[in-house]
């Protein structure tokens, strides 16, 4: 699977992505702190890190829905039109409502290492 890496030098090239799902690690989470993984409607996978690679402000420009999620350690409340899945260890998956059926039969704790592959396979 090809991953397009976004950094502070190239993030402006990706400001208009049609993001259908993204995951991030909340404060104190296990895994990649600040990691932001995004899948677009054309099945492309993007990655950045708002703790080390880009600023929080740049991350919000890339993925505006991220700013509207109300998060704490164990839950997040996404904006209308999106669904949240807690994947354990402080990791969250946020999916557009039109794509949630793909994950409806899966245990959210099983999504952590698999959601990107599952989603991309279904939309390609």
Kindly give the residue locations of the regions a language model identified.
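Residue-level detector of intrinsically disordered, flexible termini
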Residues: 20-24, 28, 37, 58
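Short glycine/serine- and acidic-residue-enriched loop/turn motifs that recur at repeat junctions
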Residues: 1-13, 34, 49-77, 103-124
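Repeated scaffold domains used in trafficking and secretory/extracellular systems
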Residues: 19-26, 73, 80-88
């Amino acid at each position: 699977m090809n991953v397009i890496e976004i950094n502070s030098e190239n993030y402006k090239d990706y400001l208009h992505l049609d993001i259908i799902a993204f995951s991030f690690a909340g404060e104190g989470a296990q895994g990649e702190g600040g990691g932001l993984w995004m899948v677009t409607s054309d099945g492309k996978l993007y990655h950045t890190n708002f703790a080390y690679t880009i600023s929080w402000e740049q991350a919000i420009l890339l993925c505006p829905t991220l700013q509207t999620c109300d998060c704490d350690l164990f839950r997040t409340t996404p904006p209308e039109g999106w669904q949240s899945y807690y994947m354990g260890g402080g990791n969250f998956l946020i999916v557009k409502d039109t794509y949630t059926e793909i994950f409806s039969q899966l245990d959210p704790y099983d999504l952590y290492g698999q959601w990107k592959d599952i989603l991309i396979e279904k939309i390609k």
